[in-house]
């Protein structure tokens, strides 16, 4: 009886030592924890195996069996973790395809470049260039002609301004001469009417008759 109790104590110490050397189960996300019932049943199986051997030589084989059993449990836990990881879809895969692929972006610069290229290729560029050159030449020649006309008109306008100023002075002089002549005629008429009234009236009648004859002939 004492021998059986000592063997059981030795087996418990060996299991605790082996169990402490194994990797911690808490690091596994989906590992199944070992309950007290599982531990007691595991101890009972170890004690039954040790009693059936009947000697202390079988302790090494029991320890190796326990280590192998723990390694198998760890491998099963790892397989279970891999299965759960594969079974649960990733969050990135749950996104719709429209969100991952927004579609092609409209390139404005590329569109403008293609449009210009098509317009140049479709038209005869050399003909357009020659037409532009001819148009530029015509515009330049007309511009020179207009400049010459403007210069001539400026010089002509200066001459006309000078003539106008001279004509204005001449007209003022003629006006003064006419006024002087009118005064002289009035003075002579008054003097002749007083000094020579008969001759003055005869001369006046002749002048009036001449005017009437001229009007009648017309």
Curated annotation (Swiss-Prot):
Record localization: Endosome
Sequence ranges of Polar residues compositional bias: 17-30
Coiled-coil spans in chain: 142-192
InterPro entries xrefs: BLOC-1_subunit_KXD1 (IPR051390), KxDL_dom (IPR019371)
Main localization of the protein described in the UniProt heading: other
Subunit structure: Component of the biogenesis of lysosome-related organelles complex-1 (BLOC-1) composed of at least BLI1, BLS1, CNL1, KXD1, SNN1 and VAB2.
UniProt-listed PANTHER family: BIOGENESIS OF LYSOSOME-RELATED ORGANELLES COMPLEX 1 SUBUNIT KXD1
Protein name: Biogenesis of lysosome-related organelles complex 1 subunit KXD1
Organism of origin: Saccharomyces cerevisiae (strain FostersB)
